[in-house]
Amino acid sequence: MTATALTATDLCCRRGDRWLFSGLSLNLARGEALHVLGPNGLGKSSLMRMLAGLLPPSPDPVSGITGAIAWDGPLALMDERHGLDLGQPLGAALAFWARVDGPVPDEAINGLGLANLLDVPVRYLSTGQKKRAALARLIGQNAPNWLLDEPLNGLDVAACAMVERMIARHCAGGGACIIASHQPLGIPALTRLDLAEYAL
């Protein structure tokens, strides 16, 4: 029997006077990748922040019951905030986080095309290069559960393929991953969750 990475039940999200989604439940097993999709404004980023524990679920608009989220093991979140010191060379910026989270494996540095950028100040990196560096930092956290919010934004076709390979490798090794993206994903055995089905 495959171990469960995440169980979430009856998640609802209200921002101000607007309900984004309601009644969302999901289970994620080890080795699985889930693609959360839907147009902008439906609450993809809000769901990711909720799953990361940064945003509390809203009480159900009918029952008043607040949903629950249970992870098996640590999780790591990657969103638009890369957290890298703009004034430092990339290698030094990653080394800072390595002292906090753990070192980034050379395999990840090479697989994400960062080996030739380690001496370049972060401020001079392109959006796509910073995105790949943020993924390298996430890999260094050695968490079994990944939350990736729009990881392909700003990436060219080759870089998208790099990121997809890293996600596939993580899941093949027993990790679990939830990816919020409006772009198609080329990841084996990917399941999908359309937030439009839970919109109010």
Describe the function of each predicted region:
Residues 6-8, 20-23, 155:
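Conserved structural motif at the start of ABC-family nucleotide-binding domains
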Residues 103-117, 136:
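Conserved ABC ATPase "signature" region
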Residues 121-130:
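Conserved ABC ATPase signature
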Residues 146-150, 155:
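Catalytic Walker B motif of ABC-type/P-loop ATPase nucleotide-binding domains
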